[in-house]
Structure formats: C-alpha cells, structure tokens
Regions:
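Conserved beta-strand -> loop -> alpha-helix junction used to position metal-binding or nucleic-acid-contacting
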Residues: 48-54, 60-96
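Short, charged, low-complexity patches
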Residues: 28-31, 90, 178
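A generic short alpha-helical patch detector that favors 3-5-residue windows
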Residues: 23-27, 49, 70-73, 85, ...
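RNase H-like nuclease fold core
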Residues: 1-50, 64-67, 134-137, 157
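Acidic/histidine-rich catalytic cores and adjacent linkers
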Residues: 66, 99-204
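Alpha-helical elements of the RecA-like P-loop NTPase motor core of helicases
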Residues: 29, 55-59, 129
Length: 204
C-alpha cells in the first residue's frame, strides 16, 4: 500500500495535516485525485507545493492548482544523484553540488550548475541531465525570503512524519487491513500535531 499524506503550512506559519489517503500504488494519477478532492473540499490559493520527483506530479499539480509554485525536493535530488557516484568521488561531488542549491540566487545557482556540469558531465552524464531537466523546480525556493527557504526546499517534514507512521504501522503480523492502517495513521498524526511548532522566522 502507498500512503498519500498532505501536510500544510497556513498563512500564519502553523503546520496542519490536510488529509491522508491509502492507495494500492503511488502514481501521478492518484495524486491528481488527491488534489482534486482537496480543491473540492475548499482548498484554494495554494502558494507553493513541495514534492518529490515522481513522474507526472508537476502536471497533476498544474492541472488543479495552475497558479501554484512547485518545489522539487532538493534532498531527494541529492540522494538520487549520489546513488550513481563512486565512493572515491562522493566527497568532492557533494561539495560541488552544494554550490548549486546554496547559491545566493537562482542565477548564481545556474552558473554553479554549469561549472558542475563542466567538471562532472563526462563521467556522470545522467546526473547532470537530471539537474538541468529539473533545475527550475529544484530552485523555486530562491523566489522566497532566505528565512523561509528551509521550510520550502525539502520534504523533510513529510519524510519524518512518514517514518513515524511506518514505524507505528509495522507489525509482525504482516499485511494489515486498510481500516487498521487508517486508524493508526490518524492517531499518529493527531499525536504529532500536538507537538508541531510555528515555522521559525515566518513573519520576518
């Protein structure tokens, strides 16, 4: 089963769970259904959505929330890149990657990507291609104030919540019913939400 989880930050900087869905597989079409349901429930004026790089997810977002910015998770991009890098290159490779997403702005990020590509492109062409293909949506966060970028450029909030849910739903009994998984997920979210704090520097 695949868990579809939507966590949000409202205009006051408060974190909220908008909902979760349990489906057989993860796909862009299923995400499209989720976004449509949220819109039907009244969700509107969505400023930005942070997501992973699932094929078709950007198109699903645009179909339902055409004015919304899309931010692909930089951490996912880094992890996927490093899977293809030899151990002897990793330390230097990581330092060069950091110059892209830690640049002062999008223009400098592109300049650093060009240098990155010049240095590593021949050895790791598929990684370089991925960075160029996804560059615009990997660097959306540069449009926002520096103080807020940490809450935008990664899906860490979702990832940490998913780890807790996975731990709580993992049992020795094997596959559990959707009803059981739903109850545990709901209770886990309820418990976690009592500890969520307002995003730091939200009103700066």
């Amino acid at each position: 089963k695949s868990l579809y989880l939507i966590l949000a930050i409202d205009w006051d900087g408060n974190k909220k769970a908008l909902g979760f869905w349990i489906k057989n597989t993860e796909s862009a079409s299923n995400w499209l259904d989720v976004f449509n349901e949220l819109k039907t429930r009244g969700l509107e004026d969505v400023l930005i959505i942070s997501c992973d790089n699932l094929s078709g997810i950007s198109q699903a977002i645009e179909a339902v929330f055409p004015q919304t910015d899309v931010q692909k998770c930089v951490v996912h991009q880094i992890r996927n890149s490093l899977l293809k890098v030899s151990n002897k290159d990793k330390k230097e490779f990581v330092l060069d990657m950091k110059k892209i997403y830690q640049a002062a702005n999008q223009e400098f990020a592109m300049q650093n990507l060009d240098k990155f590509a010049e240095k590593w492109g021949q050895k790791y062409p598929s990684i370089i291609k991925s960075w160029y293909t996804n560059f615009v949506e990997l660097t959306t966060f540069f449009k926002y104030p520096y103080e807020l970028r940490q809450a935008i450029y990664t899906t860490n909030l979702i990832e940490s919540m998913n780890r807790i849910i996975r731990k709580n739903t993992k049992t020795k009994g094997g596959i559990q019913s959707v009803n059981y998984l739903s109850k545990i997920t709901y209770l886990t979210l309820q418990n976690a939400s009592t500890k969520w704090q307002k995003v730091r520097n939200w009103f700066m």
